[in-house]
Curated annotation (Swiss-Prot):
InterPro entries: Kunitz_BPTI, Kunitz_BPTI_sf, TFPI/VKTCI-like. This is Kunitz-type serine protease inhibitor 2. Keywords: Disulfide bond, Protease inhibitor, Pyrrolidone carboxylic acid, Secreted, Serine protease inhibitor, Signal. Pfam families: Kunitz_BPTI. Residues 31-81 form the BPTI/Kunitz inhibitor domain. Disulfide bonds join 31-81, 56-77. Serine protease inhibitor. Its main location: secreted. GO terms for molecular function: serine-type endopeptidase inhibitor activity. Residues 1-24 form the signal peptide. It comes from Daboia russelii (Russel's viper).
Length: 84
């Protein structure tokens, strides 16, 4: 395969790997809550949806009254609030 064909294939795979974000109207309301960092316990890595950047971002949460914009993995965050 020529280098041009490989570049085209790579470009198509890149487009396929980054789906279009869903609209804000399709997201649950809790996706727009600010992250709750907590106050007690050992910090652990978590992810929350940031509507300002339209991305799921990592943070360290401690156990307390965490809100529902708080996910174990980036994939769970994206499936619920971000990219479909």
């Amino acid at each position: 395969m020529s280098s041009g064909g490989l570049l085209l294939l790579l470009g198509l795979l890149t487009l396929w790997a980054e789906p279009t974000p869903i609209s804000g109207q399709d997201r649950p309301k809790f996706c727009f809550l600010r992250p709750d960092f907590g106050r007690y316990g050992h910090p652990r890595p978590r992810f929350y949806y940031n509507p300002a950047t339209n991305q799921c971002q990592g943070f360290l949460a401690q156990r307390s009254r965490e809100n529902t914009n708080n996910f174990d993995t980036r994939d769970k965050c994206r499936q619920t609030c971000g990219r479909k």
